């Protein structure tokens, strides 16, 4: 019985996330802590409200607020006067704010900023299901606040950065699926695999958002995010094709996460890994650099 329990724990830990909960990776019991967090056996208060959940939720509110404020603000100004900001400028603004928020809040909450991303991480066991509702509430709250703040400060602009199809709905749906697939594929690579780019993770994801939104913008608006679409739609009372921006990102993120999970190399069992392999790629690279520097100083002495 004990052997089977250990086997189940090890198989679960293989799928645990390496970036979204750094508090579980310290010390020799990292594997057991990760298993307890991601697959709790009981529904105690500690399971439902794990340590630092409130800080993670606030982090998601702030990150999503700033994401929507920048992207919808740029889109609003472009829609009112395209001489002041171009389509390319919108795409660059979107990519940059994603990059900045990943570096600012990635070590706290994972910087999801997107309900579809949270759903996909949970489906592929990189994020605990029990925290998904809290993240969704935070993301939609941050997005709504940003949209209504923009509506107040950008008067008399009536349409606050809404995303609507410019042609047939299936064209917009196809574009949203493809561009969100691209974003999630890159995100899975840099957020769940410690062998990926590490310190450049934020730049990689931001670049993916920027590049794909350049050509997706004229067709669908390049949303890639249900919260980013719903909030300005409510603030502007414009709901044209709203279903596209829920279905497209969900299909795109799930398929992107599945493809990366399928093609990535299998790693050694978690029990055989040193504890440093449980760390996020961000933190692991820093620790390796510090260790190398310390070794050089020791050799010098």
UniProtKB/Swiss-Prot annotation:
Gene3D superfamilies per the UniProt record, alphabetical: Glycerol uptake facilitator protein
CDD domains noted in UniProt: MIP
Compartment(s) of residence: Membrane
UniProt motif (NPA 1) ranges: 114-116
Keyword tags: Membrane, Repeat, Transmembrane, Transmembrane helix, Transport
GO cellular component: membrane
Transmembrane segments: 57-77, 91-111, 132-154, 172-192, 200-220, 238-258
Domain of life: Eukaryota
GO MF: channel activity
Membrane topology: Multi-pass membrane protein
Chain positions of motif NPA 2: 225-227
PROSITE patterns, alphabetized: MIP (PS00221)
InterPro entries on file: Aquaporin-like, Aquaporin_transptr, MIP, MIP_CS
SUPFAM superfamilies reported for this sequence: Aquaporin-like
Family recorded in the similarity comment: Belongs to the MIP/aquaporin (TC 1.A.8) family. NIP (TC 1.A.8.12) subfamily.
Record comment regarding domains: Aquaporins contain two tandem repeats each containing three membrane-spanning domains and a pore-forming loop with the signature motif Asn-Pro-Ala (NPA).
Task performed by this protein: Aquaporins facilitate the transport of water and small neutral solutes across cell membranes.
Protein name: Aquaporin NIP2-3
Species this protein is from: Zea mays (Maize)
Gene it is expressed from: NIP2-3
